[in-house]
Amino acid sequence: MKHSFSRFFGFGEKEEEPEIAEHDTNKEEILEIPVHAIVPNRFQPRTIFSDEKIKELAMTIHTHGIIQPIVVRHTEDEGQYELIAGERRWRAVQTLEWEKIPAIIKDFSDTETASVALIENLQREELSSIEEAHAYARLLELHDLTQEALAQRLGKGQSTIANKLRLLKLPEPVQDAIMEKKITERHARALIPLKQPEFQVTLLAEIIEKSLNVKQTEDRVVKMLEQNKQKPKPRRKAFSRDTRIAMNTIRQSLSMVEDSGVRLNTEEEEFEEYIQLTIRIPK
């Protein structure tokens, strides 16, 4: 990794100069441990590994060997190790059917293990937008940081962190589409103003089916928002037969009163649930 874990989150902060920290592996014992005794890092932010790239890495390792050992820690099960860093190397070695792999054993807590895995992958810049967003969210949770503080420690803009985290508010089908590279991150961000998941998923299908570009997607979002503002007026309930009979009877009675010489002032108002009839009789 380009920077030591302590430089990011304050564990043993300033005990070492960065130059020394970058070469920690030279000071630690490298052991050969059984490949089958290693389990994946449960905090690994990467969920998709390219088989093609693993094969390419395996060919490189077959030719040149492993230049940088993997990093592991002991698990509760005796003789078993959990990966901290180096899952791609471990997967490549498995395809080569090696029995052992060079490793450094660390005494890391869950928090440290998760943070190292997240930071290592973020530095490689190979995560999908969704994986990156989950990594930021996990680091914020693990270290109780603000977005601004996390951005400073990772050397990124706060807007970068915020934009990635917004993607996690999108419905699962949209997130899956990003992961599967059916749409771009910019397509996904264009869907955010729609807010209603059903609208976002509907437009997602249209983007994929019609191969809409980002500008076309943004235009569709604007149109959908305008259509949503023009809400149709609620339909008035049709009069039932009993209601019509009642109103006709009342009107006939009022007409008879007026025929007798009494001047009436009447007003009828129709509401959603009822009809209001106001009668004023001068004194």
Curated annotation (Swiss-Prot):
Keywords: Cell cycle, Cell division, Cytoplasm, DNA-binding, Septation
Stored InterPro entries: Chromosome_partition/occlusion, HTH_ParB/Spo0J, Nucleoid_occlusion_protein, ParB/RepB/Spo0J, ParB/Sulfiredoxin_dom, ParB/Sulfiredoxin_sf
Compartments, as annotated in UniProt: Cytoplasm, Nucleoid
Transferase keyword on record: no
GO function terms (MF aspect): DNA binding
Residues within the DNA-binding region(s): 148-167
GO BP: chromosome segregation; division septum assembly; positive regulation of sporulation resulting in formation of a cellular spore
Keyword DNA-binding: yes
Region annotated Disordered, chain positions: 1-21
CDD domains the UniProt entry points to: SPO0J_N (cd16393)
A cellular component term, taken from the record's GO annotations: nucleoid
Similarity annotation: Belongs to the ParB family.
Function, in words: Effects nucleoid occlusion by binding relatively nonspecifically to DNA and preventing the assembly of the division machinery in the vicinity of the nucleoid, especially under conditions that disturb the cell cycle. It helps to coordinate cell division and chromosome segregation by preventing the formation of the Z ring through the nucleoid, which would cause chromosome breakage.
Protein name per the record: Nucleoid occlusion protein
Highest classification ranks of the organism: Bacteria, Bacillati, Bacillota, Bacilli, Bacillales
